[in-house]
């Protein structure tokens, strides 16, 4: 009887995994689902010879944005129609965002980046050095990438960001290089977005590094969030400034909107249901935020002069009507010098620490990105 049970176990196990036969067609089984504690748009299921990764469509949540089969070995897999096959580990990738290039640096996989778009936004010294040495090729603008250079780079995957109603990715969809659709920015929470590093770590062959880093981020973030809960002040806060004739503000359910709540700041649009940004006229923001205690903004300074409240007022004559400008409680991040965009999407604990330092000065925390704008 025992021998019969053992034989059945071996038969079932061998059948379900398909062995290591070259060219084996893998039947879809239930697999082992990797539990995501925070990410809502990402599902990862481990099968015998591959991981199945499904990305939910952030704008049509009942539909999938993309499905990947990430092979565990060089064995050939026969994938269903509409599924993208990725052979890991990826050794040659092109990133269309400094966000994901910055993460690959954190995962010690920066040497696998062979090209980037929008190099003028790069701040990380490892990336700048690789560009200088010719190890990373300038792929042009993210909106109009240099297709010839991408092909010449022999990239195994392109890390791109999906947008609602964008109409696709243009010519890069036709060159036969898999597109990794990085929808992490649409996660409603900071830790949800950061948890996507598990997917990117899987692709790059850096799973353990990604798991370890996420555990570190989660622990630090939750510690800071708990500290903020114990503070007494709840300052109101407004965010960013005019871009042309429009004021773009993060929605109340956006990553930043939720993070402001985690810092125990009362965001003026906290009740808004948008997870992305909203485009508002100046008059609307003035009505809603004129009495806000704190004004947070991102700006690009001029090398010739420091950015001051006078500089800010020169950009729009109505800024002096805000209480935060009048009392000098404006805090800015100089994106020309700062690594805010390269670091904070996957190190939200760094950002939360800054917010707590501003909202609760009694914490005596030092700032990493945001500093008081002087007159």
Labelled PLM ranges:
Residues 1-25:
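Bacterial Sec-dependent N-terminal signal peptides
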Residues 17-101, 209-238, 326, 339, ...:
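Bacterial Sec-exported substrate-binding components of ABC uptake systems
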Residues 51, 59-63, 69-151, 156-162:
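A short, structured surface patch at a secondary-structure boundary
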Residues 91, 101-105, 148-152, 170, ...:
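Solvent-exposed, polar/charged alpha-helical surfaces in well-ordered, non-transmembrane soluble domains
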Residues 109, 175-176, 263, 326:
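Short, structured coil segments at secondary-structure junctions
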Residues 135, 154-246, 270-271, 329, ...:
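Extracytoplasmic substrate-binding proteins
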Residues 164-174, 299-312:
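A ligand-binding cleft/hinge motif common to bilobed small-molecule-binding domains
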Residues 224-309:
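Flexible, glycine-rich surface segments
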């Amino acid at each position: 009887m025992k021998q019969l049970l053992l034989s059945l176990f071996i038969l079932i196990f061998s059948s379900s995994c398909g062995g290591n036969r070259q060219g084996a067609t893998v039947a879809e089984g239930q697999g082992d689902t990797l539990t995501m504690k925070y990410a809502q748009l990402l599902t990862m299921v481990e099968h015998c010879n591959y991981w199945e990764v499904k990305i939910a469509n952030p704008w049509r949540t009942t539909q999938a944005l993309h499905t990947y089969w990430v092979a565990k070995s060089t064995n050939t897999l026969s994938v269903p129609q509409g599924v993208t096959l990725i052979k890991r580990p990826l050794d040659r990738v092109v990133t269309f965002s400094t966000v994901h290039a910055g993460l690959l640096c954190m995962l010690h996989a920066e040497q696998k980046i062979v090209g980037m778009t929008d190099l003028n936004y790069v701040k990380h010294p490892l990336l700048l050095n690789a560009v200088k040495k010719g190890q990373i090729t300038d792929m042009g603008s993210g909106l109009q990438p240099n297709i010839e250079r991408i092909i010449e780079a022999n990239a195994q995957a392109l890390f791109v960001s999906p947008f609602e109603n964008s109409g696709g990715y243009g010519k890069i969809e036709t060159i036969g290089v898999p597109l990794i659709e990085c929808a992490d920015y649409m996660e409603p929470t900071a830790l949800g977005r950061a948890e996507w590093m598990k997917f990117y770590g899987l692709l790059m062959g850096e799973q353990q590094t990604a798991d370890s880093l996420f555990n570190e981020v989660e622990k630090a973030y939750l510690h800071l969030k708990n500290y903020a809960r114990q503070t007494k002040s709840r300052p109101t806060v407004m965010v960013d400034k005019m871009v042309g004739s429009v004021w773009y503000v993060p929605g109340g359910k956006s990553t930043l909107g939720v993070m402001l709540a985690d810092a125990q700041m009362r965001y003026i649009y906290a009740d808004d249901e948008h997870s992305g940004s909203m485009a508002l006229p100046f008059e609307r923001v003035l009505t809603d935020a004129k009495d806000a205690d704190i004004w947070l903004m991102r700006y690009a300074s001029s090398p010739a002069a420091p950015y001051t409240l006078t500089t800010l007022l020169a950009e729009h004559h109505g800024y002096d009507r805000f209480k935060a400008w009048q009392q000098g409680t404006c805090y800015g991040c100089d994106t020309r010098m700062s690594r805010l965009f390269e670091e904070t999407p996957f190190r939200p604990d760094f950002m939360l620490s800054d917010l707590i330092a501003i909202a609760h000065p009694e914490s005596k925390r030092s700032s990493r990105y945001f500093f008081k704008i002087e007159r």
